[in-house]
């Protein structure tokens, strides 16, 4: 069983390398037309150049998974701001794409919790489609839209989970088919359990990104031993390994909050279930210390008898 690892957005070991530098609409409005463009394009260029630095860092450390920052282009989906964030930066998008393709990196996006398809308010669905389209356009500009995924949560329950799930199935029809084809769903820590999310994924033919921490915070009746093979099966039509999210609780009191690093004892039960399933899969680490948490976990896991480190962020068990 091969396990490959990655992390989210910021490389903590790199100095001044945020790929998510911002520009607020308030500050944008205060500027003249030319100043707006100059400032906004400067921030975007920084974010893209920092992303390139991070990719080089990942390549050097043999980290095969990476989640791009959704904030890479500030104000991209703001209704009162229109600008070309693709054509102007074509050379940088292509440079990012070339690195990803040459080194066979697995790239993903994870829009925020407001991108959902369970609402009864049409503008929420419209905004979700706008946001999904923005993420897809970036993947397309990079040249990896057909091999990369945009991960979201199912959404809210709004007091009636069954009705909300019905709305999800109805609202998701409004998402263009080529974008839906590149989306995944994740179980959450309060509302939609693993089994509920799995059922939706199976019905919509959407790959399921299983989050173990969320699962432990929002347990369902079915044991993980039964669920995991079915979860991994949702990826069978993609020719890509299943992906899971790993983090651990900050404390017993703040169980849902992410700790700085991964608690090996917390994730061991999941790893043993995965080992019984004996299917290759990828792991996205969602700890606060990101790449540093990844390195620590790799060191701890590779010290376990039977687990062999075969590259910087890849283990065989």
Swiss-Prot record:
Keywords: DNA damage, DNA excision, DNA repair, Endonuclease, Hydrolase, Nuclease. Signal peptide: none annotated. One of its GO terms (biological process) is response to UV. Transmembrane segments: none annotated. It holds the Pfam family UvdE. GO terms for molecular function: endonuclease activity. It is an enzyme of class 3 (hydrolase). InterPro entries: UvdE (IPR004601), UvdE_bac (IPR023520), Xyl_isomerase-like_sf (IPR036237). HAMAP family: UV_endonuclease. Component in a DNA repair pathway. Removal of UV LIGHT damaged nucleotides. Recognizes pyrimidine dimers and cleave a phosphodiester bond immediately 5' to the lesion. This is UV DNA damage endonuclease. It comes from Bacillus cereus (strain G9842). The gene is uvsE.
């Amino acid at each position: 069983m091969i396990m490959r690892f990655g992390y989210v957005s910021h490389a903590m070991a790199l100095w001044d390398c945020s790929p998510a530098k911002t520009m607020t609409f308030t500050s944008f409005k205060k500027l003249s037309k030319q100043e707006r463009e100059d400032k906004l394009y400067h921030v975007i260029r920084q974010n893209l150049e920092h992303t390139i630095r991070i990719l080089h860092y990942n390549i050097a450390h043999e980290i095969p998974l990476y989640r791009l920052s959704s904030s890479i282009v500030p104000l991209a989906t703001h209704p009162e701001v229109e600008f070309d964030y693709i054509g102007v930066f074509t050379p940088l998008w292509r440079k990012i794409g070339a690195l990803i393709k040459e080194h066979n990196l697995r790239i993903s996006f994870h829009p925020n919790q407001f991108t959902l398809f369970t609402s009864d308010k049409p503008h929420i669905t419209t905004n979700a489609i706008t946001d999904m389209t923005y993420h897809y356009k970036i993947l397309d500009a990079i040249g990896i839209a057909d091999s990369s995924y945009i991960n979201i949560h199912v959404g809210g329950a709004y007091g009636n989970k069954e009705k909300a799930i019905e709305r999800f199935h109805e609202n998701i029809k409004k998402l263009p088919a080529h974008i839906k084809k590149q989306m995944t769903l994740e179980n959450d820590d309060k509302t939609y359990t693993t089994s509920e999310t799995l059922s939706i994924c199976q019905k919509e033919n959407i790959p399921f990104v299983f989050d173990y921490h969320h699962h432990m915070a929002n347990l369902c009746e079915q044991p993980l031993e039964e669920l995991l093979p079915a979860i991994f099966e949702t990826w069978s039509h993609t020719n890509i390994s299943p992906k899971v999210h790993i983090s651990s609780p900050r404390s017993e009191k703040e169980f849902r909050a992410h700790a700085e690093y991964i608690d090996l004892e917390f994730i061991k039960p999941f790893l043993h279930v995965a080992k019984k399933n004996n299917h290759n899969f990828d792991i996205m680490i969602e700890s606060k210390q990101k790449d540093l948490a990844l390195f620590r976990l790799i060191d701890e896991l590779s010290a376990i008898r039977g687990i062999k480190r075969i590259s910087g962020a890849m283990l065989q068990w």
